[in-house]
Amino acid sequence: MASHNENDDIPMLPISDPSSRTRARAFTSRSRSVSLSNPTSSIEGFDTSTVVLGYTGPLRTQRRPPLVQMSGPLTSTRKHEPLFLPHPSSDSVGVSSQPERYPSFAALEHKNSSEDEFVLKHANLLRSGQLGMCNDPYCTTCPSYYNRKAAQIPTSRVSALFDSTFHNALYDDAKGWARRFASSVNRYLPGIMNPHAKEVQTWTKFFALSCLLAIFIDPLFFFLIKVQEQNKCIMIDWPMTKAFVAVRSVTDVIFTMNILLQFRLAYVARESTVVGAGQLVSHPKKIALHYLKGKFFLDLFIVMPLPQILILWIIPAHLGASGANYAKNLLRAAVLFQYIPKLYRLLPFLAGQTPTGFIFESAWANFVINLLTFMLAGHVVGSCWYLFGLQRVNQCLRNACGNFGRECQDLIDCGNGNSSVLVRATWKDNASANACFQEDGFPYGIYLKAVNLTNHSNLFTRYSYSLFWGFQQISTLAGNQVPSYFLGEVFFTMGIIGLGLLLFALLIGNMQNFLQALGKRNLEMTLRRRDVEQWMSHRRLPDGIRRRVREAERFNWAATRGVNEELLFENMPDDLQRDIRRHLFKFLKKVRIFSLMDEPILDAIRERLKQRTYIGSSTVLHRGGLVEKMVFIVRGEMESIGEDGSVLPLYEGDVCGEELLTWCLERSSVNPDGTRIRMPSKGLLSSRNVRCVTNVEAFSLSVADLEDVTSLFSRFLRSHRVQGAIRYDSPYWRLRAARQIQVAWRYRRRRLHRLCTPQSSYSL
């Protein structure tokens, strides 16, 4: 009588139930390498998610019957997971067996740890919801897997994990009332935002327009001061002053909001922008330090409300209504002192260019921006001409006051009411003061037209004529102006000439070069599109294929920027090419067999990598077809669909067609006695369909290149380490081991059943 063991009642590899259903769970590890496989089995954790496992065809050795070679993955980050094929039961004849599902604590733990790692890495962006997502379908900076993962992970889990991890570090358990208040306020603040989010891009365009308004508004403060020819004095237009101060305050508020936005806006690390890829830095502390070390203090100086403080507080409180003359000098100093840094900071936005790319991409938009820049130069020159002309009128009145013989300095300010009516009437009739408003009364030079303009009551008229004068002088390089002997006037004329030359040399030349370069690229694209359209029309391709061809051409242009990297490498030294390829193709070492190879072999492989682009819904490999290349995904998402319908997603850093490497290595392998293993010339067949979910940038390695490398370095393949890695990572040997275990266990069950049957009959 055989003893009844408890473990014998529970089969180690039970027969799969035909009614069971499996679902393929997406791998969350970013370091895996998954490729094509045979009908897969799965291991199910307590969360009912399944782990998809793939298989490959046989690794042929000597004295083996011929088998059809199938494709499957070589490497996986999941270790110690049993692989097996579902075995149909006796009572399920004629019904296709379903993959078996088994509880696995390791799978559940690995899933949770992988998702937690993703959540911790991108917790700040995930908390922001839509503001943390990239809305650019042709983005070459943000990781394309982010949006999909962000949609799969619930916000509640993100918040809980983020709060438990970062709350103590950020707020020190909120021991003080200030920290508790900051902790409560932080819940209502927006999270870290993606620079490519739709809302952020809309704000950037709005901020660019507000920068244009801010640059135009500052010189307008000069037109608030005018001359009263009747009273021979200078005054401030206080009603218009309040309107200008309000507009300037609005632009300052917008700029302040943009400063606050920079502390919540993720940025792309420069060192990560390789092969079109980029890593978004979303840690709040790193973002704050990056901005503080950058242009924070310059932005803080620009946003300081100096004109508002002068007009609303300093002039009324200390100078009173008679402060027009002093206001002129203070405004000139404050506006010009703050205007130069503002131009340096805001002109890139005015040009439509930011660290994340162009704001206005069309040629006409850039043409309008360059035209507005030319208008800005005329606006600044005309405003300064009006201010300096007003200063020359003030100087003429001061000279007339010196010849007046009485204390009349206060009379130059219209708001002064301390002087008697008789003295003011005498000042009005002074011949020297009246001569200041005549053409030959004072050497005004280039400011002669500004004399009568300063006493015009209509502000729009004063500004329009000044703008016209500025345009005229920039366009003619001040060729029709002859300055007087006043040094300030001479230097101002020289500045106009230099600015005009600079605009023609840089702005006009830059606009011309930009239009020519843009036209050249557009011409190339237009010619290529025309050739493609003519070819498709000649071949009478259907509309669906034509649409895919157009999308492929567009994405290929967006991915390569019209630059052929192979042509760039041709004129570079060999060592420089090798170093560049080592830097670009670091993902090769994610494949386990490649990680065991020496650098010379990897360099030979890197030289043979070719850049490929695929559009969404493109088929990379199909079931029953030959596996002719290995594809390394750089950006985008693919999915591998098995024969049983299981779906396996592939992201950046993954590889499809990796079994091709083992197939080529086996063809170059040797037996322990040193003889070469004979392999048939038939190619490797794929058992899965691999298609693109999104647009994909990748590098491919053809089977001919792999065979070339293995033939060149065949000596290296005799290493026991490489041979062991080939057999360890081979899905065929794993499949064979799983089958042997299943056969042995079924044999043991039958023996136990035979031993238990006589005992049961005897007991009855």
From Swiss-Prot:
Gene3D superfamilies: 1.10.287.70, Helix hairpin bin, Jelly Rolls. One of its GO terms (cellular component) is chloroplast thylakoid membrane. The chain crosses the membrane at residues 205-225, 243-263, 296-316, 330-350, 367-387, 489-509. Residues 226-242, 317-329, 388-488 are lumenal. It holds the Pfam family Ion_trans. Residues 19-33 have a biased composition (Low complexity). The keyword Chloroplast applies. This is Probable cyclic nucleotide-gated ion channel 20, chloroplastic. Residues 1-40 are annotated as: Disordered. A nucleoside 3',5'-cyclic phosphate binds at residues 593-710. Belongs to the cyclic nucleotide-gated cation channel (TC 1.A.1.5) family. It is found in: Plastid, Chloroplast thylakoid membrane. Keywords: Calmodulin-binding, cAMP, cAMP-binding, cGMP, cGMP-binding, Chloroplast, Ion channel, Ion transport, Ligand-gated ion channel, Membrane, Nucleotide-binding, Plastid, Thylakoid, Transit peptide, Transmembrane, Transmembrane helix, Transport. CDD domains: CAP_ED. Residues 26-204, 264-295, 351-366, 510-764 are stromal. It is a multi-pass membrane protein.
